[in-house]
A protein has these predicted regions:
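Pepsin/retropepsin-fold aspartyl endopeptidases
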Residues: 2-168
Length: 168
């Protein structure tokens, strides 16, 4: 009986080790099997920033991926080039001066590789920041995608492969 118990124990250990290796392998290579991938490799190589180009019709719009931002932002200067829906009610924001500001919100649908993405954007004057990015890095930025976007679409940023991916 003792030999049988040892054999069963060894088999169980081998199965557990194999299952652990399989789990590690699937977790490590998740991004390769992701359902949706958004690459930011090119802009990381050029500017050191995670920027993705989306389309609306024939027009292209560049967005910084910012998981730390509270809400997505669109520069007011590009609204005339976009189709959007004005949303009722304003959001409240605070300027660098500490004063409260009323901010317009719009709903925008953008496309990346034949998949549509929608988000709510605060409309702000981003000319100082975005013009500095253009001057210093040579990249035109039209907006910023925030944590709300990543939460809605269950995206994770993978800086090893320079992609945002979703498993849902």
């Amino acid at each position: 009986m003792e030999i049988t118990s040892k054999i069963v124990l060894i088999i169980l250990l081998v199965v557990m080790v194999a299952a652990s290796i399989a789990l590690y392998h699937s977790m490590f290579h998740k991004a390769k099997n992701a359902y949706d991938k958004i690459s930011f490799r090119e802009t990381m190589n050029l500017a050191g920033l995670p920027i993705v180009t989306f389309r609306q019709g024939e027009s292209k719009f560049n967005f910084i991926l910012d998981t730390g931002a509270f809400s997505s932002i669109i520069d007011y200067r590009v609204l005339d080039k976009l189709q959007y829906t004005e949303l009722e009610g304003k959001s409240i924001g605070y300027g660098i001066d500490g004063k409260e500001h009323s901010i317009s919100r719009v709903g925008i649908v953008l496309t990346y590789k034949d998949k549509d993405y929608s988000d709510v954007f605060r409309v702000l004057d981003m000319s100082t920041s975005f013009d500095a990015l253009k001057r210093d890095y040579g990249v035109t930025v039209h907006g910023l995608l925030s944590s709300s976007f990543f939460e809605r679409y269950k995206y994770v940023l993978n800086y090893n492969e320079l992609i945002a991916y979703s498993m849902v």
